[in-house]
Amino acid sequence: FMNVLDSTIVNVSLTHIAGDFAIAPNQGTWIITSYAVSEAIFLPLVGWLTKRFGVVRQYIWSTILFTLASLLCGLSFSFNFLLFSRVLQGVVGASMIPLSQTLMMSLYPKEKRGMAMGIWSITVIVAPVLGPVIGGFITDSFSWRWCFYINLPIGLLSGYLVHRIFKSRGYTETYEKSKIDILGLILLTLG
C-alpha cells in the first residue's frame, strides 16, 4: 500500500515543492519520474536479492529502507537531495510489491490464497486513487513534507509485524550465493 501510495501522493504537491525549492513547475515532474524509473530498473533484481538474502529479510529491509528514504524526502534541503531520496525510495521499494505477494501466499493455505490476493489487490487499487486526495489534504493542511512523513509509522509497523508474524511461525529460509549478471543488468537498464 505504502509503495503504491507514494507513486501518486506527491502529484498534487508538485507546485508547492517547486515553490519551496525555487524551480520551474515542469522540473517538479522529476520527483515522480525519478521514483518510477529507479523502481522499474531495480525490479528485475528482486529475484536475485531474494535468493541471496531470503524473502522475509529482503521484505523487512526494503520496508525499513523505504521508510528511511521517505524520511530523507521529507527532510530534503534541496531539489537535488529530494531527487536523490526519491531514487533511493524507488531502488529499495522495488521489491516491496512482489515480495508482499510472496509473503501473502506463504501465510495462507491454498484454499484461502485467492481471498488473500483479492484483499491485497484492493489495497493496490485503492492506494493510487487515495494518493492525490490524501496528498492534497496533507499539503493544504500541513506541508508537502508530510506526504513523505506519513510513511514513517506505516513502514515501521509493517516491518515489525512481518518480522513478528514469521518469527512466531518458525519460518526459516535458505540462502544461496549466486552471481549477478552485470552485463544483463546494464543492458536491461539501458533498454
What are these regions (language model features)?
Residues F1, T33-V37, I64, L71, ...:
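Transmembrane alpha-helical cores of Major Facilitator Superfamily
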Residues F1-V46, M96:
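Extracytoplasmic
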Residues I17-A18, L49-T50, L82, I134-F142:
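Interfacial helix-cap and linker-helix signal at transmembrane-aqueous boundaries
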Residues D20-A22, G54, L75-F81, V92, ...:
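Helix-breaking motifs and short loop linkers at transmembrane-helix boundaries and internal kinks
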Residues I41-N80:
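Conserved MFS/SLC helix-loop-helix module at the cytosolic interface between two early adjacent transmembrane helices
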Residues Y59-L65, A69, S85, V92, ...:
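Residue-level signature of the transmembrane alpha-helical cores
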Residues V87-I122:
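Cytoplasmic helix-loop-helix junction between adjacent transmembrane helices
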Residues D140-G191:
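Hydrophobic transmembrane-helix bundles of small-molecule transporters
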